[in-house]
Amino acid sequence: MATRLLCWTALLLPIIAATAAASPLPEACPVPTAAEEILGPGGTCTTLDRRGDPVGVIEGDEVTLAKAITLLHMNKDDYIAVLFYASWCPFSQECKPNFEILASLFPSIRHFAFEESSIRPSIISRYGIHGFPTLFLLNSTMRVRYHGPRTVKSLAAFYRDVSGFDVSMTSEAVLHSVDGIELKKDAEQENCPFWWARSPEKILQQDTYLALATAFVILRLLYLLFPKIGSFAKRAWRRHTLFPNLVGVHEYFFTYLEQARHKFFRLYPSKRGNLQEGARNATAWASKSLASVSIGEPSTIGRTNSTNELR
């Protein structure tokens, strides 16, 4: 009996060991990404298991933005901070590191950053964005846009005024360390323009339908206006060419008339002399007539007066 028990034990031990090795061990709770932490579907791990993991700034696209707005309407988060920036903008390069510091100063506020190339211009225009960077603080009832210096201290004051949240106790040292940073520019710092700074290649890639619609409208307008533009150009060209022609005809006429006068005087020089002599005689006769009239006027007046006295 004991021998059989030992034999069965020897046979069952390898089977039990193989079964134990094949069975999976309970896995540790996986650490999700920042986007999965906030926006992704819930997994097997609870939120309490991931409480110590920092979230930071969530980089996303249009889908992430839509989910972030959904969070507000579902009242999962009281406030979220949204930064629209452009990688080619130097002001965005200065603002984005400060935005990341704010994410650690205010862990209760979710921070989202959206690069200009990952969002359609129609969505950017919907938010009234005309330049980069642009920062919003949103909740389910309001949307507040930040205007002012982009230092950490100024942005933290903006957060406190709008949300009522204070800086985290563990992050106060970070805030004190950045207090000494001097403001290099005025209160209203410059922005990089949204539409004009974009290259046509990016517009064509990101908004193909908008580019095609704009091209169609422009070509349609040219098709309708081209006949009028052509007729106006023809009239302008005719006026431009007609005026020099008229001036040329006028000059040619007077030149021809002068040549005809010279030829006439060459053929008949005596007539030229007679004309000149007649002109001089007419001048002399006119001067003599004026002199006789001026001398005879007083005598005539005297005779008239004496005749009146005799009467």
UniProtKB/Swiss-Prot annotation:
It is a single-pass membrane protein. Keywords: Glycoprotein, Isomerase, Membrane, Signal, Transmembrane, Transmembrane helix. The chain crosses the membrane at residues 210-230. InterPro entries: APRL4/6, Thioredoxin-like_sf, Thioredoxin_domain. The keyword Lyase does not apply. Its main location: membrane. Residues 1-22 form the signal peptide. The keyword Isomerase applies. This is 5'-adenylylsulfate reductase-like 3. It comes from Oryza sativa subsp. japonica. The lineage of its organism: Eukaryota, Viridiplantae, Streptophyta, Embryophyta, Tracheophyta.
